[in-house]
C-alpha cells in the first residue's frame, strides 16, 4: 500500500499540468498545495513524503487528488455538517498549522514560527460542535454562516492573544451556544462564555451574530473590544452572567447590539497589564444599543474607569432589585446621542449592604453636556442621577425621574428645574419645559421627583 501511495504521489507531481491544486487528505483535514509548492516534494523511503516543508506519513494519507480549484495563501477553511467537520489548510502554511478534528469539534494550533497572519473562514451547522484556536500571530476570523452548539464548553474559543479581526460576513446568520453541562464555577476560559476571545478584537461586517450564554456570559473577551462602523447585528439572546464581559476597554462606533442578561449587560474591567489610556473605560460613539437585565444588584452597563457616551441610540432597562442602569467609579460624561435608562427594582440588601436602584451612578462627576438623556429610576429610593461628586447640566436635553431627587451643581452652564410629587403613570408621557419623555409600561411612580434641563 505504501508503494502504491508513493506512486500516486509521483503521478500527481508529474501529471497535473492543467490543474491547479494538489489536495492531500489526512482524516478530516485537507492540505491544498499549488503546483509550485510541490517543487520541493521529497520522499523518505516508503514511509513519508515532505511537501512544502510539511512531512506526511504515507500511512496517514487517505486520499490524494489533483483538482481544478484554487485556494488563497494564508487561509484555513472550516466547514461543519452535523456531527462532522472538515478543514482545508492552504499549502503555504501547512507546516505551521496543526489541526485536529473529533466529530465536529475542531482544534487548531498555529506554530509560533508562523510568519504571517491567517484568515480563518468558519461555516456550517452542528448541534454538537466547537472551534478552538491558539497561536502567536494576529488573525482574521470570517463567520460565514456558522451555527455551533457545544454541550460542555464555549462554542468558539480563540486563544491567540493578539489582534483578532472578527468579520460577520454579509447576509449571514451566525449562532453560538455553550453547554448546560458546563460547570459555571470552573475557572477555565472554555467555560466563561458562548464565545471566548483571548486577545484584542475588532469587529466588522454586516452579518448577524447571536450568542446564547447558558453557563456564564454571552461574550468573554480578555482584552479590548471595538465594534466598528458598518457592523451588522450582535445579539446576546440570553446570558446567565453578563451579556458582554470585556477586559481593558469596550468601544462601540457602530452596529446594532441587543443584550438580554441576568447579570450585567456590559461589564468592562480594567486590565492591570494594560497601558492603554482607555483602560477600564466604556465608550459609546455610535450605533444602536439595547440592554435588558433582570438580576439582583447588577448593572445595565458598568466599567472600572470612565464611561463616555458621545453618540448612538442607547436604551438600558434594568428590572432587578438593587440594580442600576449605568455605573462607574470614574466620571460619566454624556455629550451626544440619545440615551434612555429605566430601573424598576426595589432596594435590596446584599451581603449586609443596601443597594439602591439608581438610574445613573458615579463615584465622580456626572456631566450631561450634549445629546438627549432620559432616565426613570425606581420609585423605591432610586435617583435618576446619583454621585459622590457633582452633577452638571451643561447643554444636554435632560429629564430625570426618580423616587428621590437629583440636584445638579450651581456651576452647571445650563439652567435646570426640579419638580416633586408628580404622579407618573405606567406608559404615560411626561412633559416639562419643552422636554418630553414617554416612560415604558413597566415603570410607574406616584410621587416622582423630576429634573429637567434643556
Which residues fall in each region the model found?
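Structured surface patches comprising rigid loops and adjacent beta-strands/short helices at the edges
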Residues: 34-43, 57-69
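Short N-terminal segments immediately surrounding and downstream of signal-peptide cleavage
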Residues: 20-38
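A composition-driven surface/loop motif
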Residues: 69-454
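Sec/Tat signal peptide C-region and signal peptidase I cleavage site
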Residues: 15-19
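Short, hydrophobic/aromatic-rich segments at coil-to-beta transitions
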Residues: 20-22, 45-48, 115-122
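Short polybasic amphipathic segments
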Residues: 20-24, 47-51, 427-432
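Sec-dependent N-terminal signal peptides
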Residues: 4-13
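Extracellular interaction modules
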Residues: 55-60, 390-393
Amino acid at each position: 500500500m505504501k508503494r502504491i501511495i508513493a506512486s500516486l504521489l509521483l503521478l500527481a507531481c508529474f501529471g497535473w499540468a492543467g490543474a491547479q491544486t494538489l489536495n492531500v487528505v489526512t482524516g478530516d483535514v485537507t492540505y491544498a498545495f499549488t503546483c509550485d509548492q510541490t517543487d520541493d516534494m521529497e520522499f523518505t523511503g516508503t514511509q513519508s513524503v515532505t511537501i512544502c516543508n510539511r512531512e506526511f506519513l504515507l500511512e496517514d494519507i487517505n486520499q490524494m487528488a489533483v483538482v481544478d480549484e484554487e485556494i488563497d495563501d494564508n487561509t484555513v477553511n472550516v466547514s461543519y455538517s452535523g456531527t462532522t467537520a472538515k478543514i482545508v489548510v492552504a499549502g503555504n502554511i501547512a507546516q505551521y498549522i496543526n489541526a485536529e478534528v473529533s466529530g465536529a469539534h475542531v482544534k487548531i494550533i498555529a506554530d509560533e514560527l508562523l510568519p504571517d497572519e491567517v484568515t480563518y473562514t468558519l461555516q456550517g451547522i452542528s448541534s454538537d460542535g466547537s472551534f478552538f484556536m491558539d497561536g502567536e500571530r494576529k488573525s482574521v476570523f470570517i463567520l460565514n454562516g456558522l451555527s455551533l452548539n457545544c454541550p460542555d464548553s464555549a462554542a468558539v474559543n480563540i486563544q491567540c492573544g493578539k489582534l483578532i479581526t472578527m468579520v460577520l460576513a454579509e447576509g449571514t446568520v451566525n449562532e453560538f451556544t455553550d453547554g448546560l453541562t458546563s460547570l459555571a464555577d470552573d475557572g477555565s476560559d472554555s467555560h466563561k462564555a458562548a464565545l471566548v476571545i483571548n486577545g484584542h478584537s475588532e469587529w466588522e461586517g454586516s452579518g448577524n451574530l447571536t450568542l446564547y450564554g447558558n453557563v456564564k456570559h454571552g461574550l468573554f473577551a480578555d482584552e479590548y473590544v471595538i465594534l466598528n462602523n458598518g457592523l451588522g447585528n450582535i445579539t446576546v439572546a440570553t446570558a446567565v452572567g453578563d451579556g458582554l464581559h470585556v477586559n481593558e476597554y469596550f468601544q462601540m462606533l457602530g452596529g446594532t447590539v441587543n443584550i438580554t442578561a441576568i447579570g450585567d449587560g456590559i461589564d468592562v474591567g480594567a486590565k492591570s497589564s494594560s497601558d492603554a489610556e482607555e483602560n477600564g473605560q466604556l465608550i459609546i460613539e455610535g450605533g444602536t444599543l439595547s440592554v435588558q437585565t433582570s438580576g439582583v444588584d447588577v448593572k445595565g452597563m458598568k466599567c472600572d474607569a470612565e464611561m463616555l457616551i458621545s453618540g448612538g441610540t442607547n436604551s438600558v432597562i434594568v428590572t432587578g432589585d438593587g440594580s442600576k442602569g449605568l455605573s462607574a467609579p470614574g466620571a460619566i460624561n454624556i455629550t451626544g446621542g440619545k440615551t434612555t435608562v429605566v430601573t424598576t427594582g426595589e432596594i435590596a440588601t446584599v451581603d449586609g449592604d443596601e443597594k439602591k436602584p439608581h438610574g445613573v451612578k458615579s463615584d465622580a462627576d456626572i456631566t450631561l453636556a450634549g445629546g438627549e438623556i432620559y432616565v426613570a429610576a425606581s420609585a423605591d429610593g432610586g435617583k435618576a442621577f446619583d454621585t459622590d461628586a457633582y452633577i452638571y447640566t451643561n447643554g444636554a436635553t435632560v429629564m430625570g425621574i426618580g423616587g428621590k431627587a437629583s440636584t445638579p451643581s450651581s456651576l452647571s452652564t445650563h439652567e435646570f428645574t426640579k419638580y416633586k410629587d408628580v404622579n407618573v403613570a405606567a406608559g404615560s408621557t411626561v412633559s416639562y419645559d419643552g422636554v418630553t419623555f414617554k416612560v415604558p409600561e413597566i415603570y410607574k411612580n406616584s410621587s416622582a421627583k423630576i429634573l429637567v434641563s434643556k
